[in-house]
């Protein structure tokens, strides 16, 4: 399929049930042997062909029975309810991976997710401060997640960890933080003091551009 020109630039949150550092980013197995988590994005600038996506927010709750590369994952996409039908369709086309080069984020997701639950269209509250390592997501009746700095276990002082991934397909640089998650949609789980990555990203059909 011919690739359509698209662009997503904005704030990116990835929270999961793994220990701080997310073993998946190091090609290791998930902390608990399986993965449950979420991604969310506030699109500051975006488009799919001539459809503008500026300002929209989306999220996805995900799970895998083992390591991500082994596949058999499930996903429930969530798009901000104010998105127009054309904008919703544009985002679903991006999520499909059919308009992305091989080995890029959405192409990889299309290979390792075998079940997609019915999408949800709902208000999305999204706050993000990468410097302070704080974030908050609220989707009524579906998802609650808070992010705060990792704390030194002795002094309680904020503990900063920055990860650089020059060849990353999700982001190039991220601040690592501590997440609390309560998911009550099709994929149900709760975590406390688990992994969070906060990043600013630029995704295109050719992958990460910034």
Language-model segments: residues:
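Extended, charged low-complexity segments
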Residues: 150-210
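Charged linear interaction tracts used for macromolecular binding and regulation
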Residues: 73-157
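Short, surface-exposed loop and linker segments with low hydrophobicity and enrichment for Pro/Ser/Thr
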Residues: 25-34, 66-71, 119-138, 176-183
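N-terminal ordered "arm"
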Residues: 2-48
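Low-complexity, flexible helical/coil segments
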Residues: 50-57, 77, 112-118, 163-164, ...
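Aromatic- and glycine-enriched beta-alpha-beta binding-site module
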Residues: 33-105
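Short acidic, gly/pro-rich beta-turn/loop elements at beta-sheet edges
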Residues: 28, 49-51, 87, 147-149, ...
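Residue-level detector of functional hotspots within protein domains
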Residues: 2-4, 8, 25-27, 63, ...
């Amino acid at each position: 399929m011919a690739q359509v020109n698209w662009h997503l630039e904005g704030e990116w949150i990835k929270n999961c049930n793994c220990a701080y550092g997310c073993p998946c980013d190091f090609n290791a197995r998930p902390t608990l042997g399986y993965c449950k988590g979420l991604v969310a994005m506030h699109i500051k600038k975006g488009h799919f062909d001539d459809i503008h996506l500026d300002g929209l927010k989306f999220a996805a709750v995900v799970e895998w029975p083992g390591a991500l590369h082994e596949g058999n994952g499930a996903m429930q996409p969530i798009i901000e309810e104010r998105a127009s039908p054309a904008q919703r369709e544009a985002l679903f086309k991006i999520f499909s991976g059919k308009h992305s080069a091989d080995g890029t984020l959405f192409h990889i997701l299309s290979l390792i997710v075998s079940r997609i639950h019915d999408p949800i269209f709902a208000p999305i509250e999204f706050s993000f401060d990468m410097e302070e390592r704080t974030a908050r997501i609220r989707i009524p009746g579906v998802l609650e997640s808070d992010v705060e700095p990792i704390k030194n276990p002795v002094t309680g002082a904020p503990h900063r960890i920055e990860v650089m991934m020059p060849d990353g397909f999700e982001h190039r640089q991220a601040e690592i933080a501590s997440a609390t998650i309560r998911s009550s949609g099709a994929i149900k789980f709760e975590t406390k003091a688990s992994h969070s990555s906060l990043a600013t990203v630029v995704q295109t059909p050719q992958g990460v551009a910034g």
